[in-house]
């Protein structure tokens, strides 16, 4: 799981069965972070009654739909994925589930599915950030041959991009966490959040995780696709979405 070149997979189609890692033991599941998402693999399926209109699931689905309809970050990513041949469908590619209390979402590359932690996401702004963060992982999965399960450099790069472009490290969010700084504060926030995400989903030493993040940081931090810039605020994201929507008009008039 990702906690939040050539095209690797078309998200509009079911992935071939042989691509799924199918962890053979609890040890393997913990190594890949699946233990943080207990509903993965149908281990904790809930009854229809428990999934009624008044549960976390229904609220999660409503907030997801609102994010897809109104968040400029999410709208740009959904449009970019569709343009890349990886159309995202709400019912197929998102799943509201109960998770470990330490995570808010995840991208399951084995199923091309985004997990939204319905028991940990309670506000729309939080949902918007999680959806954006995980859609960046999905976008990377669509556009590149990402080896999520055994190449830590690939995982680190996508985590850096997700932290950088999703608004996770915006001034408002950092202010709410009482994290203050001036010189390269955004870069340090991105580095720290990418590191924590890797440590949460992989059995790897902190020293190795730091080394991998440092190795790929500059190139991945400066990869702003599909935004074309770092969207530091919703206003920036709206401008980026407008530019993305108008990109074909420019070339048509040349």
Curated annotation (Swiss-Prot):
Disulfides per UniProt: none
Record keyword Metal-binding present: yes
Pfam families attached to this UniProt entry: Peptidase_M76
Enzyme class: hydrolase
Membrane-spanning residues: none
GO molecular function, one term: metal ion binding
Alphabetic keyword roster: Hydrolase, Metal-binding, Metalloprotease, Protease
GO cellular-component term (any): mitochondrion
Biological process annotations from GO: mitochondrial protein processing; mitochondrial proton-transporting ATP synthase complex assembly
Family to which this protein belongs: Belongs to the peptidase M76 family.
Protein name: Mitochondrial inner membrane protease ATP23 homolog
Species: Danio rerio
């Amino acid at each position: 799981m990702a906690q939040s070149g050539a095209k690797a997979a078309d998200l509009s189609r079911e992935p071939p069965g042989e691509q799924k890692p199918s962890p053979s033991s609890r040890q393997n599941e913990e190594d890949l972070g699946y233990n943080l998402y207990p509903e993965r693999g149908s281990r904790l399926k809930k009854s229809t009654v428990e999934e009624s209109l008044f549960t976390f699931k229904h609220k999660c689905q409503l907030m997801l739909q609102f994010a897809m309809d109104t968040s400029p970050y999410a709208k740009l990513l959904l449009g970019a994925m569709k343009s890349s041949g990886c159309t995202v469908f709400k019912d197929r590619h998102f799943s509201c589930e109960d998770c470990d209390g330490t995570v808010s979402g995840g991208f399951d590359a084995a199923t091309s599915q985004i997990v939204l932690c319905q028991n940990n996401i309670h506000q729309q702004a939080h949902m918007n950030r999680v959806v954006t963060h995980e859609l960046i992982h999905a976008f990377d999965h669509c556009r590149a041959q990402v080896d999520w399960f055994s190449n830590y450099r690939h995982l680190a790069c996508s985590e850096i991009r997700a932290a950088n472009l999703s608004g996770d490290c915006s001034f408002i969010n950092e202010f709410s966490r009482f994290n203050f700084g001036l010189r390269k504060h955004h870069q340090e926030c991105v580095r720290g959040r990418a590191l924590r995400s890797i440590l949460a989903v992989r059995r790897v030493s902190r020293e190795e995780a730091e080394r991998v993040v440092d190795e790929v940081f500059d190139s991945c931090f400066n990869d702003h696709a599909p935004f074309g810039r770092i969207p530091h605020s919703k206003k920036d994201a709206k401008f980026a979405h407008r530019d993305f929507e108008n990109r074909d008009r420019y070339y048509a008039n040349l």
